[in-house]
Amino acid sequence: MADLSLYRNIGIFAHVDAGKTTTTERILKLTGKIHRLGEVHDGASTMDFMEQEAERGITIQSAATTCFWKGHRFNVIDTPGHVDFTVEVYRSLKVLDGGIGVFCGSGGVEPQSETNWRYANESEVSRLIFVNKLDRMGADFFRVVEQVKKVLGANPLVMTLPIGREDEFVGVVDVLTRQAYVWDDSGLPENFEVKEVPADMVDQVEEYREMMIETAVEQDDELMMAYMEGEEPTVEQIKACIRKGTRDLAFFPTFCGSAFKNKGMQLVLDAVVDYLPSPTEVEPQPLTDPATGEPTGEVATVSVDAPLKALAFKIMDDRFGALTFVRIYSGKIKKGDTILNSATGKTERIGRMVEMHANDRNEVESAQASDIIAIVGMKNVQTGHTLCDPKHECTLEPMIFPTPVISIAVKPKDKNGSEKMGIAIGKMVAEDPSFQVETDEDSGETILKGMGELHLDIKVDILKRTYGVELEVGAPQVAYRETITKAVEDSYTHKKQSGGSGQFGKIDYRIRPGEQNSGFTFKSTVVGGNVPKEFWPAVEKGFKSMMDTGTLAGFPVLDVEVELFDGGFHAVDSSAIAFEIAAKGAFRQSIPKAAPQLLEPIMKVDVFTPEDHVGDVIGDLNRRRGMIKDQEMGLTGVRVKADVPLSEMFGYIGSLRTMTSGRGQFSMEFSHYAPCPNNVAEQVIAEVKERNAKK
């Protein structure tokens, strides 16, 4: 069995243009995995293997790859940097032990970098920082280091310093060993010499070395005391301190280079080995109670000898068939084994298992704790399901995905395309839990729901190219909600007595606004037997079933509290179904009396703009009914944070590019629901009525 201390499960994440995929390519080249390098700007990168990715030059799906460096096994996951795909970042962070945050030497810390960094902090993932593209015009390593401190609130520990700036960037100095690595102009990673530190950098290197040692020895009291008394620790002692501090998120070892020009990458790979944790050094995954979702107090110990515990973290359908990507936390698995899916209660036999290299695969006979593999042809597995030993059932902490906020109606151009579309969408929903589908009962239209415009654009594109389904696409629709603002006390009787056994159910109830995010809550305070206890669940079920369709415009209803306090029943004619029907009628009768209100999704918007355009950007956000929350002066421009209704954000990227001459960037994520202004609510309700009239 492989030694788990030699494993590194790492992710590479960053903003869209920071050079993340190129960095991954270089890692694969240096570790001997690929021979010709694929450049993203040629659309030929190894990791970006979907047509949509190659064309748009952005990474959409985290592709997993196994490679080796200095006797260590790296499982590398390349994650997307675009905000509409943060679900992929979140999903991959769940199965990583460490990461490399890539920042552009000229762009610095971009809005998306901050979102990904926050996710990584929440997941407590240890990271290295790689400041890339130092050969670019305007690149400044030290400015980016300052941004990491200010914008991310992180503590970068500078490990290498750049030799030369912009097009004169030739290499890096390793601050710890005081050695200079200088590359020639061939672009080949192996063509470098190790030299003495350039004379004009000696003082700077010593200054950064002293800062590094002072920060590192804080991890070891004895070493710190010795250092304060003038005794310098050895390189190995310093490395041990850096390793501990990195693991505890006290700081982030920071490197520089140019992935595209192949300069500085070897030191980053060495740092993955030296400083990022092995699977046995991170907090083990908690086990949860499947009924409540609460932690049981037990964990999935990272050990080959423990019973199997694995998490299916990604489903993909490619030209080879269905692939289930699995991170094994405990135990081992081999071809022919029968495993239990604790979410469905069903067992499956393991057929083929493969190690993935972007779009290629190597078959394996067995895998063990800490491996990331893909299993071919699993039937009933979805993202977030736990796979375990049938004799030792368990459930790993599940993945929670954000709720979609935007939808489009689609139908196949070809009448015979419906079945084909249904099968294709079914596969896509299994692959991406933040992408949902439903059928409009009245119109029969298929409604696709997602995290943003780009997210849905790409889904439509995949349907067209991968599955050959041409679609007619409707305008994007916002996921509005309804709620009530006033308490109502009311009574409703359902009576149907026309010979034979009839139906009778009378309920007296109060409906009032619930706490925010409470959904639907029900309680019964009936005293005596006016509504027998066995009918209470039917009353609750009746009310709850009506929450999907509000009375204003048919949108789902949020945050309503119902109290059943009295009623009446008939010894012969009363039944659970009679009380359920009574509750449904009561909902329709009383919600309009409770001052219903339309709610709209509010997005947390983060805009980066050059300083000379900030007035235009803020004016535009105000026109979009935005609330400006914060403004921060950066070194390269201004960051504006605002809460803006989603309905006002369609096509925003085009407007922002026009306003800022193509230099502005933004990210947005769902924040909360808030009441619509009356004029907006009236317009939305009128549009819904008009649409319904046409059906």
Swiss-Prot record:
Binding locations of GTP: 14-21, 78-82, 132-135
SMART domains registered for this protein in UniProt: EFG_C, EFG_IV
Domain tr-type G, residue spans: 5-280
SUPFAM superfamilies given in the database record: EF-G C-terminal domain-like, P-loop containing nucleoside triphosphate hydrolases, Ribosomal protein S5 domain 2-like, Translation proteins
One of the protein's GO biological processes: ribosome disassembly
MF terms in GO: GTP binding; GTPase activity; guanosine tetraphosphate binding; translation elongation factor activity
A single Gene Ontology CC term: cytoplasm
Localisation: Cytoplasm
InterPro entries (UniProt xref): EFG_II, EFG_III, EFG_III/V, EFG_IV, EFG_V, EFG_V-like, EFTu-like_2, G_TR_CS
Main location: cytoplasm
Coiled coil segments of this chain: none
Keyword terms, alphabetized: Cytoplasm, Elongation factor, GTP-binding, Nucleotide-binding, Protein biosynthesis
PANTHER family in UniProt: ELONGATION FACTOR G 1, TRANSLATION ELONGATION FACTOR G-RELATED
NCBIfam families from the UniProt entry: EF-G, PRK12740.1-5, small_GTP
Record's function text: Catalyzes the GTP-dependent ribosomal translocation step during translation elongation. During this step, the ribosome changes from the pre-translocational (PRE) to the post-translocational (POST) state as the newly formed A-site-bound peptidyl-tRNA and P-site-bound deacylated tRNA move to the P and E sites, respectively. Catalyzes the coordinated movement of the two tRNA molecules, the mRNA and conformational changes in the ribosome.
Family: Belongs to the TRAFAC class translation factor GTPase superfamily. Classic translation factor GTPase family. EF-G/EF-2 subfamily.
Protein name, UniProt field: Elongation factor G 2
Native organism: Vibrio cholerae serotype O1 (strain ATCC 39315 / El Tor Inaba N16961)
